Amino acid sequence: AAAAVSVLAACAGNTMAPVASGKPAPFFVSSTGSGRGGDLGGLDGADRLCTSLAAAASLPGRTWRAYLSTQGAGGVNARDRIGAGPWANVKGVVVASNVTELHGANNVNKQTALTERGDVVNGRGDTPNNHDILTGSQPDGTAITGSVDTTCGNWTQSGAGAAMLGHSDRTGLDESVPAK
């Protein structure tokens, strides 16, 4: 489950809670993985990783959520974990106004899907290409159904299973609107 591959996760400030500043909640692509491949300690561990990375980058206090789905009984959709939007990158550029836009005609691309420190993530054409993001999700942000593991055992395994990935630069995907 991605044990030997460097993969990233996307983190979003949950906007279900009031945002005192009136600004969109930040959205970032993590610059650092757990060091254990797809074993992020489940959703709670992944959320803690997002919170830790945000705190280290002095991002405003939010309830941080990893953009990850889980499978099986009690499965969770990534799109349902991150609030209603809007979301902006750490430089204030709005990447999506709402959940529908986030999973459709959004502004997520190589120049806007920044790390928590505001750095561009290496993508297609860069060495190394680090655009793979763990999601365990379909392009619309819902969990993948069926018996094939696409979440590294719901983000608790690094030696077995597989993970569905997205691309932070949105290149190399199919040409459908949700995949772009």
Label each residue range with its predicted role.
Residues 13-180:
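Secreted/extracellular ectodomain signature
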